A protein has these predicted regions:
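Cofactor-/ligand-binding subdomain signature composed of acidic, glycine-rich
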Residues: 1-10, 32, 245, 252
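Conserved thiamine diphosphate
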Residues: 106-112, 162-195, 239-266
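Glycine/aspartate-rich loop-and-adjacent alpha/beta segment that forms the canonical ThDP
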Residues: 199-267
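Short gly/pro/ser/thr-enriched loop/turn and capping motifs at secondary-structure boundaries
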Residues: 44, 150-153, 215-217
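Residue-level marker for buried hydrophobic side chains located in beta-strands
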Residues: 117, 144-145
Length: 268
């Protein structure tokens, strides 16, 4: 936010702060040979798949040293060597691209899978139906991963669809749908995504995954967030921070000590 206000970042920026568990838990199942596409809020997946942070920040600043040579900005990040085939500023724009990439993997018999990351709002775009239908018909190796953060810009998802859970749409296409109610628990997301990955890697066709999470900030840097109460946002920030929850998990399971985690935090 500070860099945006100072004019360092060029163009619109859409933060994924608060959705760290959803991003990391999903991407940990992907190798560099797998492929993923994402949306305007794709920084989280890009970081989780080891995008060079200096090059990412250079891209946000519009510099030629950026991952997209300074021409893509915040919404168009790509790192082909690590399977990141691009984030997309068009709502629902990644679906058809992912289906095409999945068709290539199937045709070449690579054994790799493709993931299309999106928010809840994009699932009401026509391209979602068209892409899932084609992927299901041809049994393509693609996962449609939905991060349901409850709001499509300012539209509450409960006012935008009569379907209480988006993953249930999978039934209409004859494919499995997987649901993670607690998308701020990175281990829960990892387990849910693992089931979908096993299904798709097994040559059984596509799957839909829905995880429920929450973005701390507005839809973009231009969004004042007046459609949400301060109490609602503070509840998520103070009591459901995915990073703090994972930190507590590591300590409670004796995987890492408080001192070790403090040292990592200071390095960051």
């Amino acid at each position: 936010n500070k860099l945006v206000r100072r004019g360092f970042v060029q163009g619109m920026t859409h933060f994924s702060v608060g959705e760290e568990a959803a991003n990391v838990g999903a991407v940990q199942h992907l190798s560099y040979d797998d492929i993923f596409f994402s949306n305007h809020r794709g920084h989280g997946q890009s970081i989780a798949q080891d995008m060079d942070l200096n090059k990412m920040m250079a891209e946000l600043a519009g510099k030629a040293t950026g991952v997209s040579k300074g021409r893509g900005g915040s919404m168009h990040l790509a790192d082909f060597e690590k399977g990141n085939y691009g984030t997309n500023g068009i709502v629902g724009g990644s679906y058809a691209l992912a289906v095409g990439a999945a068709l290539t993997q199937q045709y070449k018999e690579t054994g790799n899978i493709v993931v299309a990351f999106s928010g809840d709002g994009a699932t009401n775009e026509g391209s979602f139906h068209e892409s899932v239908n084609m992927a299901a018909t041809w049994k393509l190796p693609v996962i449609f991963f939905i991060i349901n953060n409850r709001y499509g810009i300012s539209m509450d998802i409960r006012r935008a669809t009569n379907t209480p859970h988006l993953y249930t749409r999978a039934e209409a296409y004859g494919i499995p749908g997987f649901y993670c109610e607690d998308g701020n628990d990175v281990m829960a997301v990892y387990d849910t995504m693992g089931k979908a990955v096993d299904h798709v890697r097994g040559g059984n066709g596509p799957a839909i995954v829905e995880v429920e999470s929450y973005r701390w900030f507005g839809h973009s840097t231009a969004d004042a967030g007046v459609y949400r109460t301060k109490e609602e946002v503070d509840e998520w920030k103070n009591n459901n921070d995915p990073i703090i929850r994972y930190r507590d998990y590591l300590v409670s399971e004796n995987i890492a000590s408080v001192e070790e985690l403090d040292a990592i935090q200071s390095q960051v």
